[in-house]
Structures are given as structure tokens and as C-alpha cells.
């Protein structure tokens, strides 16, 4: 193996963040990138090590990575993550936390490089096959993928684990061995330790053949993207919701493909066939007077005004009152609803000295809003303004004392209208 086996065509960026666990694969990747940097002095290289806290050896692994990076003059970032039981399983949760840390560490203009190789690609394909995935899932990993507003690169994806080990031995590299890699209770370890050696003994080029199949699946998926682009444009609104009327006349297969692509655009996890069927039957085709909702982890799919919405699950806040004693500073809202602030210049009057300021999520009685004749209850205003039901008890309502002044981004009451040019605006950062 020479430095040329690193897929340098991917390395157009001069700023690289390498994921570095200290294991064999990432050690070879970092070594290759250090050699690449020697040949290209304009390259800026950093490494990141994730301390999961799962192994009693985790602290010693950090010290090992620090030693390696100091020797190779690579700045190292160590991120400690906390893993809580979220129902995903420890493998999936650790991966989620790891990539979240990567995203938070990346600097502007920097790309992430990870050390997946051909055997990893084979394992990923087989795991997707076990789950009954279609072409999208069987595409496995690409050498270049969008990630956190930049790119995730896998420059070693064409190399086998055996080739990486030969390189490491030839160059006297030291690496750590994670004891959990020998536990075949984990699906990926089972494939690596038991299934793949047997398959490769029978068919030595099995991983390469699987990688070709993954590439063909990826090509088919890209072709579908091209063929369905026009349909997708017709179905998706400016808000990112999915219009149902065009889907009604589509075949089941075409409609499912559109649903998958819409969910992918919303960064949703890839749905199973059963999940797609439930979305269509239980949400899209629910009776007209229903407010259907299907939960997916901390997200929901809802229907409103003949459109499907992919939204974050938020508990209703209609009984919540948040005091705002210093209204000149931003106020944090509960339930992850963001912040609100009153900024100079706007159509709201400032609170009088004797008026307390608060944020609430319900308002009783008949309300009179600017630009409308007569009074109406809040429920009627929500309906007239086209506010979806799930936003009606999570939209901040500004009160001065017991008087409703405004609903963030929706309306201003007559009692809240500015009386002079010294008004303010209610800004909601959701």
C-alpha cells in the first residue's frame, strides 16, 4: 500500500478534520493524511477523538491519541460525550453522539475525514440487507457525503482491512485495540468475526463484489432522484410541507418513492415500508375532521390543510406562564421553544412602568386584533390565520399585566398597538 491508495481526489479542501479513535483504521488514515500534508504544505490538518466513557480504558486511549498527535504535530480535539438510554441501542446512540460532536467541532471550510474501508462497506451493506432495505439503504456509504454544511470524506473506502494492517505494520504504527470489538453480541462484530471470514474463505473477493452492488444501488437511486425531481417539485411547498393532492393519483410505488425523498429532505430517518404505509393510511387518508399524528422518536408527521408536516414533538404549553421581569433582555422559553425578545422599532407599544410582562400560551375571552373588525376568540383567530393546531398552544403570547398584546409573528391586539414611534417588535427565535 502506498500513499497513492488514499483517494486523494477527494481531498480538494485544504482544511481537514480527521476522526481519530486510535484504532488501526483511523491510525492509518491519520498517518496517510500526515504524509499528504507533507506533500501539500497548504493543508491544515486536525484530529478529533471522542471519549464515550464506555470502556475502563477510555482515559488511556485519550493519552495514546495525544501522544500520536504530538509526535505527528497534529492538533487534537478531545470531546467527551454522555450516552443516555434513548431506546436506540448503545451502538446507534454512540454513533449519533459521535457525529454530533464532529458536527459541533468542524470549523468553517473544514471537511471531516473518517476511516471506513472496504470491509466496513461490506458490513454496512449486509446490515442493511438484514433490515430489508431498498436501493437507498443498500447504497451503503459513499466516498463523499454531505455533512453538517460541509463534506464527510472516506478516502480509504476502496481498501481492505488487511491492506490497512499491512501498511501499519510496515510503517511501525501503534494502535489501540477496543475490547468491545471482540464482542459478537454486536451485529457488526458478528459479521466481522464470524460471517465474513467464512464468506471470504469461500469467495475471496466477496467484499469487493458487495461494494460493486452497493455502487449500482447508489446509481439506481440517483437515477430515481432525477426521474422524480419534477414530481417532487410539484408536491413540496415553500414551507417544506408535502401537498397530498398530487399524490392521490400516483401509483403506490411512485407515491412511496416521493414520500421517502420528502422525508430525506427533512433529515428524517429512512422509513420502512410498513412506516410508509402507516403514514399514508393513518395520516394522509384520515377522515377530514381528524387531526392525525404519527410519532417517530422526537418527531411527528401531521396533516393540516391537505399537506403533510414533519415537525418536532412539543408538549402543549397552554397552562404555562413565564414571567419576564427584565423585558429588555431575551427570555428563554420552556420545552425547547427557543427565545423571545423585544427589540426597538415596531408596532407594539412598550410596557408601562406599572405593567408586569409575561409570556403565556392561552388567552381567554373575546380579542380585538389590528386590521380586523369586531372581536373573536383566540381559537377563531388561529383558524383564520391558518395556524396549524400543534402551534396554537406553543406560539408565545405577550401579556402586559392581564392584557394580551401580541402573538409572536401572527397578530397584534388593539390594546397592544404602538401609540407613537417608540414601539417595539416581538421577535421569536424558535
Curated annotation (Swiss-Prot):
Enzyme Commission number(s): 6.3.4.19
Known catalytic reactions: cytidine(34) in tRNA(Ile2) + L-lysine + ATP = lysidine(34) in tRNA(Ile2) + AMP + diphosphate + H(+)
GO cellular component terms, A-Z: cytoplasm
Subcellular location: Cytoplasm
GO molecular function, one term: tRNA(Ile)-lysidine synthase activity
Subcellular location, principal: cytoplasm
SMART domains, A to Z: TilS_C
Domain of life: Bacteria
Residues reported in the UniProt entry to bind ATP: 21-26
UniProt keywords, alphabetically: ATP-binding, Cytoplasm, Ligase, Nucleotide-binding, tRNA processing
One GO BP: tRNA modification
A Pfam family matched in the record: TilS_C
Function: Ligates lysine onto the cytidine present at position 34 of the AUA codon-specific tRNA(Ile) that contains the anticodon CAU, in an ATP-dependent manner. Cytidine is converted to lysidine, thus changing the amino acid specificity of the tRNA from methionine to isoleucine.
Domain topic, free-text comment: The N-terminal region contains the highly conserved SGGXDS motif, predicted to be a P-loop motif involved in ATP binding.
Recorded family membership: Belongs to the tRNA(Ile)-lysidine synthase family.
Protein name: tRNA(Ile)-lysidine synthase
Organism expressing this protein natively: Salmonella newport (strain SL254)
Gene: tilS
Amino acid at each position: 500500500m502506498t500513499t497513492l491508495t488514499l483517494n486523494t481526489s477527494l481531498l480538494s479542501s485544504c482544511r481537514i478534520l480527521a476522526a481519530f479513535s486510535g484504532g488501526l483504521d483511523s491510525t492509518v488514515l491519520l498517518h496517510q493524511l500526515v504524509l499528504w500534508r507533507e506533500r501539500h504544505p497548504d493543508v491544515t490538518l486536525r484530529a478529533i477523538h471522542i471519549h464515550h466513557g464506555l470502556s475502563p480504558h477510555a482515559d488511556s486511549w485519550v493519552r495514546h491519541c495525544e501522544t500520536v498527535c504530538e509526535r505527528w504535530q497534529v492538533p487534537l480535539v478531545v470531546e467527551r460525550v454522555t450516552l443516555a438510554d434513548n431506546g436506540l441501542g448503545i451502538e446507534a446512540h454512540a454513533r449519533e453522539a459521535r457525529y454530533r460532536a464532529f458536527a459541533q467541532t468542524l470549523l468553517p471550510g473544514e471537511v471531516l475525514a473518517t476511516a471506513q474501508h472496504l470491509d466496513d462497506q461490506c458490513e454496512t451493506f449486509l446490515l442493511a440487507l438484514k433490515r430489508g432495505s431498498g436501493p437507498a439503504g443498500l447504497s451503503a456509504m459513499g466516498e463523499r457525503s454531505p455533512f453538517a454544511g460541509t463534506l464527510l470524506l472516506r478516502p480509504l473506502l476502496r481498501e481492505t482491512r488487511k491492506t490497512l494492517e499491512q501498511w501499519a505494520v510496515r510503517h511501525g504504527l501503534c494502535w489501540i485495540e477496543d475490547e468491545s470489538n471482540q464482542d459478537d453480541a454486536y451485529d457488526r462484530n458478528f459479521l466481522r468475526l464470524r460471517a465474513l471470514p467464512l464468506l471470504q474463505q469461500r469467495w475471496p473477493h466477496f467484499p469487493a463484489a458487495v461494494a460493486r452492488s452497493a455502487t449500482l444501488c447508489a446509481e439506481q437511486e440517483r437515477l430515481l432522484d432525477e426521474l422524480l425531481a419534477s414530481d417532487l417539485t410539484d408536491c413540496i411547498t415553500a414551507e417544506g410541507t408535502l401537498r397530498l393532492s398530487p399524490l392521490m393519483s400516483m401509483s403506490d410505488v411512485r407515491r412511496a418513492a416521493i414520500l421517502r425523498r420528502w422525508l430525506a429532505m427533512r433529515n428524517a430517518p429512512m422509513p420502512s415500508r410498513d412506516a410508509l404505509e402507516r403514514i399514508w393510511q393513518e395520516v394522509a387518508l384520515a377522515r377530514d375532521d381528524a387531526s392525525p399524528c404519527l410519532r417517530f422518536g422526537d418527531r411527528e408527521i401531521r396533516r393540516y390543510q391537505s399537506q403533510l408536516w414533519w415537525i418536532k414533538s412539543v408538549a402543549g404549553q397552554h397552562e404555562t406562564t413565564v414571567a419576564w421581569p427584565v423585558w429588555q433582555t431575551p427570555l428563554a422559553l420552556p420545552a425547547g421553544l427557543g427565545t423571545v425578545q423585544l427589540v426597538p422599532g415596531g408596532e407594539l407599544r412598550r410596557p408601562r412602568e406599572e405593567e408586569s410582562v409575561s409570556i403565556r400560551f392561552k388567552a381567554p375571552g373575546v380579542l380585538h386584533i389590528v386590521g380586523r373588525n369586531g372581536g373573536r376568540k383566540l381559537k377563531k383567530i388561529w383558524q383564520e390565520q391558518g395556524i396549524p393546531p400543534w402551534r396554537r398552544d406553543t406560539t408565545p403570547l405577550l401579556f402586559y399585566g392581564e392584557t394580551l398584546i401580541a402573538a409572536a409573528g401572527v397578530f397584534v391586539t388593539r390594546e397592544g398597538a404602538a401609540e407613537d414611534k417608540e414601539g417595539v417588535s416581538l421577535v421569536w427565535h424558535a
